[in-house]
Amino acid sequence: MTRYAGLGRTRPKKLTPKAPIPIYREHQIDDLEEEIQNGLQQVETGVEKAEESEYHLQVAINAVASGRVVNEAHIPTPETVLSNLQYDELYPPVFSQPATYIRFSSTVEDCCGCPYNMTDEDDVFLKIMNEKRDPADRCTEDQFEEVMNFFEETVRLKQPYAAVGSAPVLSFAEMQESMDATVEDYVRRLAKDVYDHWKTRRLNNGNQSLLPSLKFETGAETDDTDPYVCFRRREVRQVRKTRGRDAQSADKLRRLRKELEDARQLVALVRQRELARKEMLATERILFLQRAEVKDMKRKLNIKDDDEDLINQKPKKKPIEAPPMQRPAAAQLRMPPKPGAQAAEDLQLLEDVQAEKENEIIRDIKANIAKHMKWNEGYVDFTRAPLSPSPERTVDISFRPAITTQLPTPPSSDSSENTPDLALDMSGTVSYRDKLDEHALIMSEDANKMPSFRRRIGRGGRLLIDRRNFASRCRVELDPWKADRFKYDQEDSDEDLDYEMDQYDISLMQNRAIMLAKARDQAHAQAQAAQVRRLQAEQAALNNLNSGQTSGQTMGSNPGPGAIAPTPET
């Protein structure tokens, strides 16, 4: 259980292109199980993942896990001191406090000297080379380092990425081209002998620099486990792009483009202006030379004439003659108008401009309506509020007076004995009266006061006839209650008229709010009045009860003079 506990608490790392993935064959299954067991033991080692595969660390961990006794294992480390020289004896600590910390004004580069340091190979080559040369012309170690440094600096300037690609090593001719006045004479003299040695070392080093430098990442897989790689790249989190960020970037680019276009246009205009000035100067120069030739020719031919044509004459302005009997206008400080300028137009009023715009809009609307009606010829537009409504059959809904020429029988509601004698006139209209006789309705011979009827079509194609009775006139002696009974003596139509209205109209909403407020106030007032009446009734009942008790006590006993009446209990 202990071995598998660490595996459950460890998250598997994501696969990366840099991590090698092993491939196992069928005959490697047993070894695979052993490696899995070893991996379970290596989960909690306390060191970094890249250092868990160290040999001595694995030996120590496996020994502890198996419980067997082995020799003490240790991780070897290199010695910090490479030689047995005692620097304290060679350099005695003799130090004197300086008067000032600044002892010289040389720069750090001047004090460092040559950055190239000789190696054992260089020392062997230098000794062999000096044996072949004269004692007076031998090369010292400092001179050798200067020559090697010159080669390295030249390659760094001409081939900065020589180590990345497969660039060839610079030839000696290219090295000689780089020798300028700053190069010492001994470098020129010893360069040819040292070049072959430098080229050999450069090729052995993979055409990389021989100077000690910091080691950076090269993109190889060994960079992750190489402890000497400095300034490692880290995984930079990708910036999350949003539409707002894209819009801001687009606005910035658009603004920058506009500024650049404006600057470019200004530069183009300035260039055009300068070219025009240059052309004008050239024209003036040609004109001046031609005038000089004309002047010389006049002198040779002895032509006596004015030289006005040789001078640029400005046209004189014609004076404006003021009309007679007119007061001269006051002097105005205005710029003189240009010769090609147009005359100023009359100032237009804002009302005129707005009226013109409105008239133009109305004309456009009428033109569009006429065009739409022309398009819809022969068609019926059933859309809502059409521009060209379909012609509907007009129905005369007005009432028409009923003119009777004959009444063969009296009304069925009248009895025979009470019916007055009616003279039937076949040639004219018949006038008749009801039971009220002269006290009720008086019919007029005017056609406008005659009974009228109206015909209309209801639902389902039913034919309906509405009637309008005589106009009644109430006399003084007629009871108003009796006259009012005929006010609504008419039949209701079968078809109820629906009045469409917007229930969300402001006026209707205000009306409903006012009516609801009034109803609420009335209900509140009624409740208060009912409560007051209830309190008054309770108070009256209590007063009646108290008065009855007082009268009973008075009738039961007859107190003498000076007696005190009992106080009523409340």
UniProtKB/Swiss-Prot annotation:
It is found in: Nucleus. It comes from the Eukaryota. One of its GO terms (cellular component) is NuA4 histone acetyltransferase complex. Residues 541-570 are annotated as: Disordered. Keywords: Cell cycle, DNA damage, DNA repair, Nucleus, Transcription, Transcription regulation. GO terms for biological process: DNA repair; regulation of transcription by RNA polymerase II. Pfam families: EPL1. Residues 543-557 have a biased composition (Polar residues). Belongs to the enhancer of polycomb family. Component of the NuA4 histone acetyltransferase complex which is involved in transcriptional activation of selected genes principally by acetylation of nucleosomal histone H4 and H2A. The NuA4 complex is also involved in DNA repair. Involved in gene silencing by neighboring heterochromatin, blockage of the silencing spreading along the chromosome, and required for cell cycle progression through G2/M. Component of the NuA4 histone acetyltransferase complex. This is Enhancer of polycomb-like protein 1. The gene is epl1.
